[in-house]
Amino acid sequence: AVVFDPPPALWAEADXQQEPLRNLTQTVGQYLPTLSGXLAE
């Protein structure tokens, strides 16, 4: 499975404009492996 995990430097650069987007991406990133695991089983 491909996990979207940008380097911290990219997040630091985008903090000012994209904090909500980062939070959403982190939340999705936490749940995607769980969903994929359940579907794989």
UniProtKB/Swiss-Prot annotation:
UniProt keywords, alphabetically: Glycoprotein, Immunoglobulin domain, Secreted
Known glycosylation sites: 23
Keyword Glycoprotein annotated: yes
Predominant place of localization: secreted
Subcellular location: Secreted
Gene Ontology annotations for the cellular component aspect, listed alphabetically: extracellular region
Keyword Glycoprotein among record annotations: yes
PTM comment: Glycosylated.
Quaternary structure, from the entry: Interacts with CRISP3.
Protein name from the UniProt record: Alpha-1B-glycoprotein
Source organism (scientific name): Equus caballus (Horse)
Recorded name of the encoding gene: A1BG
